[in-house]
């Protein structure tokens, strides 16, 4: 059984974060794998750095953004980590916080968490007093 699937993903190499063209830390310049021309694309990076996983020279997995309202063509979803002692081995790490929220929600809906079955109600990203809980 699959719980969640990312479709239409591409791999890419981060060349600059923040972007040289858009100085927000939530945008990175990325060269997409498999493209004829090496063109830097603006890519939304919804998390800040992730302990060095979203920095220059790092490989990532991206999803395509279809909205005309954004300057970014893709969103960074996952990081690819390679160990020094075993560089052929890829460790894929989720770095988009929304992915974690979506997967947790699906687990609740499908009763995948022992001790948290048949949940009647829940809310995502709920404010508590003057702060928000993620």
Regions found by a protein language model. Name each.
Residues 18-20, 92, 117-134:
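Active-site metal-binding core of divalent-cation-utilizing nuclease and nuclease-like domains
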Residues 1-106, 112:
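Nuclease-adjacent, charged terminal/linker segments that flank catalytic cores
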């Amino acid at each position: 059984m699959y719980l969640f699937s990312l479709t239409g993903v591409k791999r890419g190499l981060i060349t600059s974060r923040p972007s040289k063209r858009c100085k927000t830390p939530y945008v990175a310049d990325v060269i997409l794998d498999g493209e004829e021309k090496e063109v830097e694309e603006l890519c939304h990076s919804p998390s800040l750095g992730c302990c060095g996983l979203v920095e220059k020279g790092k490989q990532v997995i991206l999803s395509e953004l279809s909205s005309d309202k954004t300057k970014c063509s893709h969103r960074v979803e996952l990081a690819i980590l390679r160990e020094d002692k075993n560089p052929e081995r890829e460790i894929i790490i989720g770095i988009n916080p929304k992915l974690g929220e979506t997967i947790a929600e699906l687990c609740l809906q499908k009763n995948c968490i022992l001790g948290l079955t048949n949940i009647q109600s829940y809310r995502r990203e709920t404010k508590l007093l003057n702060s928000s809980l993620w």
